[in-house]
Amino acid sequence: MAAAAPPVLRGLRDAAMVGPCRGGGEPPGWATNKLGGRADALPSVRPGCPRCGACGAALAHLVQVYCPLGASPFHRLANVFACAESACWGRPQSWKVLRSQSLEARGQDALGCGSKQKEECNFSAKDWCAEADDWGGCDGTESSTCALQMLGLNAGMSSSASEEAQCVSQLQELHLSEAADVSGSLNTDLLLREEMVMATSAPVFHSYYISVVDEADYAGFLDTDHANKLLKEYQQREGVDLEHLMSESFAGEDSNEKYEKTKVRSGDHTFHKFMKRISVCPEQILRYSWGGQPLFITCPPANFDNSIPACSNCGSNRVFEFQLMPALVSMLWGDADLSVEFGTVIVYTCERSCWPTNQQTPLEEFIFVQEDPDQKLFK
């Protein structure tokens, strides 16, 4: 008997994130699913501040996904970044996805899903934010104080005389044997300050919470008029018979002669299947299915699965985890005409979700970007 397909969860844009960082016992920012804003940092992990591999600019933060796995003791966070320079949008080196993990106790985790996850001793997409409406975190306009707190530098910004005197006193008490430790501490502090500068120089999109729904539960409750309108517009512009083509995609692809009569451009068959799948919920901005199958918007390269690189840390295979959907494009906005365009962005992560002991920086995972074959379909 074939194994059941992994469940699929959808991410939808919710309320705008406003106000200061949460506190007073409320959930920490890193336990938040959000689009835009700045990436949050897990305890004991420095925030990632990636730069574009093409132009060198600081990458903008697109999406944060809090995604602990059921059989793992780790908090787990994935952040997707992209270059906001239009010349870089379609370049693979202009996109980054960083995975962070922390062994902090999850018994009282911020999303309130600890008890449920303890009952599920398997890695499942169901573990992604079972109580996703319990939000926390900083918005895209977070203060410099909040940024310093994330980087652990809030104590280093004061220039008061009393603190200077205290520093002098501490230095006078140092022994020569402590010199190496001091040097290492200073180097770490300088590195953190450099990362802070990089983080604050990156463009920032307006931030919104992401709410989560189960694809199986969501089906049948939405009006599909919007999706049907998009498909009809495409049919009129390209002169193709969409109903005939999509019926073939589900009935089988053994009728090449009929397919050719539609005079469809190369890649359209994949595009129509993509549109058919998302038509029930065209406003979805994120699709999550750990270990499942991605939806390609155009035909991927031949033998694509074999080209997905193994985990650079442990050498294990990578599996599909989530993808960014076309509707996200129109929801990414900021000052000075800030924008990023794409068709879909597919993220593959280590199947073991490895995390080295004492790791203090995020691990980079594999990201595959497909450009939109016709961006105006999703405006």
Curated annotation (Swiss-Prot):
Source organism superkingdom: Eukaryota
A Pfam family of this chain: PDCD2_C
GO BP: any one term: apoptotic process
GO cellular component, one term: cytoplasm
PANTHER family: PROGRAMMED CELL DEATH PROTEIN 2-LIKE
Descriptive protein name: Programmed cell death protein 2-like
InterPro entries on file: PDCD2-like_regulator, PDCD2_C
Signal peptide: none
